[in-house]
Amino acid sequence: MKKEHIEPFFATLKAANPQPNTELEYTSVFELLTAVLLSAQATDVGVNKATRKLFPVANTPQQILDLGLEGLERYIQTIGLYRSKARHLMETCRILVDQHHSVVPRTREALEALPGVGRKTANVVLNVAFGEPTMAVDTHIFRVGNRTGLAPGKTPYEVEMKLMQRIPPEYLVDAHHWLILHGRYVCQARKPLCWQCAVSDYCSFKPKTAKP
């Protein structure tokens, strides 16, 4: 993607969706952290189905601890890797209660010290909950960054660094949502919907797919 195409690329995405947000359902920072932790290798739809049952019963660190490991597993067993996720969430809740007064920390260092929370999860929480200009590179953003030529890279971290450098500051806080949604619904993995893509003119992907 040419440098002069980056601004209109994001301006177009913004015009179509001025106030983007995550599709994970949450009402507090802790609920967001929990949902993101559960979302690894799972769909937002699947996570939402589980948390709609979990959160009315337990939506604080202490309430999760009170469920016990087996109790928590019963609520999230429809999600992939639920046993390890349950263990990580229980350990995270114990740290939040013991070290952070049950409050989700606002620093990357403290977030990444929580079990099951890596760089991507920390970036999501920092961006969505606290409005920090971070870029959580998931499979959708990795694909869009490479396919469009916006931020080609061999690793998620490399794509993240290029995106942080290339995205105009005024778009950075919301760029994470625009790129995820674009990858999820338009620039799809198996067959991108180029014929209905609003930013196709700015994209470096050559074999544009035609309308069926």
Predicted region positions:
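Catalytic cores of DNA base-excision repair glycosylases
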Residues: 2-212
